[in-house]
């Protein structure tokens, strides 16, 4: 019998996908969507499959930005910290949901950092929105 494991399967989940329908989103709604996602992943891949999940977090970061702007007395955090917070939040919810679906599986959350060139000309023409879209000013 061959004990060699196959390469891991990478699944990318969009930040909007993890929230469901148009917001505002509650914590319970986010958990329900993540729980359904974990159910689908557990039913799609067998317990021996090494699975790597990656996810977006644009709308989640936007929600935190809106919360910070609404809290006039609280000092605002920088965007990089908000990104890390939402990575950890989503990772926590996914890890908990996957642990519930497959208690025998080893699941972990990893918060990442990206190094960018502050002089990159792409900063002059941003194309990736963060947060909600508004229909009027």
Q: Model-found features: residue ranges?
A:
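Flexible, active-site-adjacent loop/turn segments at secondary-structure boundaries
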Residues: 16-17, 59, 79-80
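Ligand-binding beta-strand-loop-alpha-helix segment within the catalytic cores
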Residues: 70-137
């Amino acid at each position: 019998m061959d004990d060699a494991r196959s390469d891991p399967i990478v699944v990318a989940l969009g930040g909007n996908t993890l929230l469901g329908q148009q917001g505002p989103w509650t914590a319970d709604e986010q958990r329900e969507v993540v729980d359904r996602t974990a159910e689908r992943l557990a039913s799609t891949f067998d317990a021996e499959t090494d699975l790597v999940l990656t996810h977006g977090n644009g709308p989640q970061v936007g929600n935190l930005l809106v919360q910070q702007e609404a809290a006039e007395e609280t000092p605002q955090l920088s965007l990089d910290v908000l990104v890390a917070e939402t990575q950890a939040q989503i990772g926590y919810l996914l890890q908990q949901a996957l642990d519930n679906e497959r208690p025998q599986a080893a699941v972990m959350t990893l918060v990442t950092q990206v190094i960018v060139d502050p002089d990159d000309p792409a900063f002059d023409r941003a194309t990736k929105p963060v947060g909600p879209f508004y229909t009027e000013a």
